[in-house]
Amino acid sequence: MVALLMNGRKLLPACILLLFHIAAGQAAAPGSSGQTPESLSLKRWITPLETTRLGEAEQRLKEAIENPEYMLEHWVELPTSPKALHKKVQRLGLREAILLALRYNPNIQNAELDRIVQRYQLRLAENEFELQYALAGSAAVDRSHFSGIGNNTSKSYLATPEVHMKTKLGTTLSLNMDNNVNTYNNYSPVLNLGIKQPLLNGFGKAVNEASLLNARDAEWLNKINLRQGVSDQITQVIGAYRTLILSGNNLENQRRQLKEAKKTFAINEKKIKAGQLEPTGNIQQSYQIESLSLMVEQAENEFKTSAQDLLQTIGLDPETRLSVPSDVEVGKVTVPDLQQSITMALKHNTQYLAQKMLLRADERAYTVAKNRQLWEIEVGANVQSGRVTDVDGNNGLSGIYNGRNITESARITVTIPINDLNRRSQLINAKVKLEKDRLNTIAMRRALITKITNTINNIESLAKRYQLAEKQVKLALQSYQLEKKKQQAGIASALDVNNTQNQLLQAQAGLISAKIAYLNQLSDLQRVLGTTLDHWHIKLRYGE
């Protein structure tokens, strides 16, 4: 019996390579011991042509995220995984599974594409306080009919370049020039410069900059969400990968038990023929064989399903044939420190950070709503230079700057809201929402601490379960070896040996299950803490 080594100790028989032809694809159960080295290249998974295709798509995505207007003339065209090229089974390590998911998982690709739109939302918010340009133009033809006199046709053309800008204090500056050109080539442009400044309602950076600050917070949170989204997918890949290992071990365990049950049945048949056992002495064993056959069938179906789930989670072709290791490595069993984990979660947990950002946005909305209750007092000034019509023949641009035709005006506008329920409603809603989100933030903080506490308690319990499972395997192995010696001495039956061997197989299956449960709980904790990418030494290619 080939034994698998981990931490210098024999743990369980290595699972032989199992190949199953699945309706929608093919996979192989756990093979030899040990995991594929994480440094193994992905070249055997990705052809040179596919590598080139990936590189070009990555470059397009990078350009689109850095400059979203790249999408006006181009497509990103992220590639999906190619069809399986290898008919032979390929060994897949956990690190390889994660790296392939980073390239082909559709949820990760969608999150990367979302960054294009998200970056442009920030650009839109910044554009509010940038210089705005526009060019307007119009042409008109008027025809008049005068009874007894005749007809008259007049044509007019107007081209108006416009520039305006809004500052963070609420000041609005505008500049436009009306260019009038008629049929007599009488060009007489008019330049208008205007300025408006609210003094109460709409005044101040806190009011006018609120949307921009919200957009900046949203952009920062979008980066965090991208990391969290990738972390969630990686955790799913890890879970699916370990589930396949567990289902493969379960299948192999059920097959071994069925094999041993058939051996016992054959031995009993010989004893019945020799008169050493009653003719009905094999009925119970026949029932055991049928029960185990059913369990093997169920285990085979679970294994096939787990294989397809892993391929789908990674984003690979369903017809890909792969094998995974028969065991997982735990290394040193550790329980994370509770206080350190809570501190890290409060700094990096995406949902909690999103709630804090929402609270900040509510505070800004409350400030804006309070400002909206004030009187609307606006001062403005306007300077017009030039002439609409030319009366002395000195037309052209000189009419703008010669100082002869300047009109200056100033104004103040006051609007006093009286029983304006809409404005009052805005303030009421803002205060209620702010109060609710304050309570929600406190509740979410407590819920996060509770979740971290429960998770670490589970990790501690699973660590003890794993250590107990190791001892159980050791004792079951000793019991099995003892029964073998008894059988050789003639004081133990084959049935006794089979029973102790089944106990050993069950203990080994329990050990694998305990290890995977412990590791999965650690992976889930890393996901909640926001440290999954750091743990796997992954740096996002785009969007940060």
Regions found by a protein language model. Give the residues of each.
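Short segments within alpha-helical structural elements
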Residues: 58-61, 117-120, 125-127, 247, ...
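Small/polar, glycine/serine/threonine/aspartate-rich low-complexity segments that form flexible
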Residues: 83-89, 136-197, 325-335, 367, ...
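Periplasmic alpha-helical coiled-coil/stalk elements that build and connect Gram-negative outer-membrane
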Residues: 223-344, 458, 462-465, 503-505, ...
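Amphipathic alpha-helical coiled-coil scaffold segments and their short linker/junction regions
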Residues: 101-102, 164, 277, 281-282, ...
